[in-house]
C-alpha cells in the first residue's frame, strides 16, 4: 500500500526545513524511511513477494544515496537526521 496523503503531509511537516518544503533531503529520507519500514513489515509476512522485495531494495539504495549526499554536504544535518529517524545504532 502506498503512503497516504495525510501521513505524508504529517512527515513533511515534521521534517521540513521551512514552510512549503517538500523536496529537501531530510523530507525525502524521512518519507523513504517510512515506506521502507512499511515494506519490511509486508516482506516479513509475504516472503515470496519478490517484486516488492526488489522495490524495497531500490528504496533502500535511494535513501543510502541521499544520506551519503547529506553527509558530504552538511555533517551536522546528517547527524541530526539519523538520530531523529533512529537509523544508526
Swiss-Prot record:
SMART domains: Ribosomal_S15. Gene3D superfamilies: 6.10.250.3130, S15/NS1, RNA-binding (1.10.287.10). InterPro entries: Ribosomal_uS15 (IPR000589), Ribosomal_uS15_bac-type (IPR005290), uS15_NS1_RNA-bd_sf (IPR009068). It comes from the Bacteria. Transmembrane segments: none annotated. The keyword Ribonucleoprotein applies. GO terms for molecular function: rRNA binding; structural constituent of ribosome. PROSITE patterns: RIBOSOMAL_S15 (PS00362). GO terms for cellular component: cytosolic small ribosomal subunit. SUPFAM superfamilies: S15/NS1 RNA-binding domain. Keywords: Ribonucleoprotein, Ribosomal protein, RNA-binding, rRNA-binding. GO terms for biological process: translation. Part of the 30S ribosomal subunit. Forms a bridge to the 50S subunit in the 70S ribosome, contacting the 23S rRNA. One of the primary rRNA binding proteins, it binds directly to 16S rRNA where it helps nucleate assembly of the platform of the 30S subunit by binding and bridging several RNA helices of the 16S rRNA. Belongs to the universal ribosomal protein uS15 family. HAMAP family: Ribosomal_uS15_B (MF_01343_B). This is Small ribosomal subunit protein uS15.
Amino acid at each position: 500500500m502506498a503512503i497516504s496523503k495525510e501521513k505524508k503531509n504529517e512527515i513533511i511537516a515534521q521534517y521540513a526545513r521551512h514552510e512549503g518544503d517538500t523536496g529537501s533531503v531530510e523530507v525525502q529520507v524521512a518519507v523513504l524511511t517510512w515506506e521502507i519500514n512499511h515494506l519490511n513489515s509486508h516482506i516479513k509476512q509475504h516472503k515470496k513477494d519478490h517484486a516488492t522485495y526488489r522495490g524495497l531494495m531500490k528504496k533502500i539504495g535511494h535513501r543510502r544515496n541521499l544520506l551519503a549526499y547529506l553527509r558530504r554536504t552538511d555533517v551536522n544535518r546528517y547527524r541530526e537526521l539519523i538520530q531523529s529517524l533512529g537509523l544508526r545504532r
